[in-house]
Amino acid sequence: MNYSENILGTIGNTPLVKLNKVVQGIDALVLAKVETFNPGNSTKDRMALKMVEDAEADGRLKPGGTIIEGTSGNTGMGLALAAIVKGYKCIFVITDKQSKEKMDILRAVGAKVIVCPTDVEPTDPRSYYSVSKRLGTEIPNSWYVNQYDNPSNALAHYEQTGPEIWEQTNGKVTHFVVGVGTGGTISGVAKYLKEKNPNIKIWGIDTYGSVFKKYHETGIFDENEIYSYITEGIGEDILPKNVDFSLIDGFTKVTDKDAAVYTRKIALEEGIFVGNSAGSCIKGLHFKPDDVVVVLFHDSGSRYVGKMFNDDWMRERGFLDEEITTAGDIVKENTSKNLIIVRTEELVSHAIDRMRQYKISQIPVIDVNGFVGSVDETDLFQSYVTDKNVADKPIKDVMGKPYPIVKLSTPIEEVSKLFNRETQAVLVDLENGKHHIITKSDIIGSIK
């Protein structure tokens, strides 16, 4: 019979899959090392188990102990699987930018999860680096993993991932491309492959807001390179000991938008449901026809269903390249919402209350015959300057002209021309007896 003694025996030997549609225009053979086939659905299973086994061997991790680590989610999952099989407890410290799915998954496998702010310095006592390190000193019989500086991280990929890639390509691999976070994957694989063939190029994918690319090119740790970014799993505001820059031939930086867009393309065009660091890798590809390129896909798209695989999340960040050409394109996501109005017989105070409640600045005014006027913040301010008791006046005493009404098919250029000092909004006829409003901010928001 052929079976594993436990789930840890299924780690590794993940497949290489040829990429086709998503790499059109790239003449090279591009192969994806799909690490989602690991039991914890990420490449981090490899180094998590290796770090645990090495800590057991030298006595850092003792029976019944508690494993403590700062993680973006995937390392935590790998450590949790090892802890379940081997009988340890887990406490994981994670940043608030990580997906809810990652946090829920860690809790599902028995870990205690502590969430820390993202936008703080690494040395700040609130950072997930500092909190995890502190817990490692405070909790009895605990072991702080520190994947960033733990040599077993890179060693796992030197012993496993590198040899797998070499054997699966029959030694024909010319380039290895991977997102860089802790540095263990790129450094471990690079060391093995360059020992086999020094001409193999190792390329790291970095993100804007991270220090890796500039440090590799100049040797300067530039704090001006550090700012918040959305992409998970790659980039850092520190220099982990596991990043061996001498083994890396170059870095390419990829934007948050490109990472998200290309992650969706991989799922739609290749049927490979992977995380957003995979999208970063694909966007960074530029090679020659004879090259054999191995791109490592870190983790599963299931960790990101509430983020780049969610249209609303993408749209809120301007990541969806939707073509907006008509008034209908602007209002299509809001057609089910009721238009906020005020009636001529109501008071100015009623309009003010609705502006506050719905956080809007313009309101159409109606009577029994339809739209007869409008009121906006400018109208109210000017009325208040001349009459401090304006709130008690009928709205018809302060209203301006009614907003122009356009069809759903009206070109956005024509809609834009209707805006001026007196016209702060335009109404769209939804052709079902209802209307919706377009404001200047809606027009600006449609600009790509």
Report the location of each language-model feature.
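PLP-dependent amino-acid enzyme catalytic core
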Residues: 1-329
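A short, polar/charged loop-to-alpha-helix boundary motif
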Residues: 379-396, 443-448
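Terminal peptide-recognition signature
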Residues: 83, 165, 355, 363, ...
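The conserved cystathionine-beta-synthase
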Residues: 340-359, 365-367, 384, 405-424, ...
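Short hydrophobic beta-strand motif reused across regulatory alpha/beta modules
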Residues: 361, 372-380, 435-443
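Bateman (tandem CBS) regulatory domains
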Residues: 247, 324-339, 346, 392-403
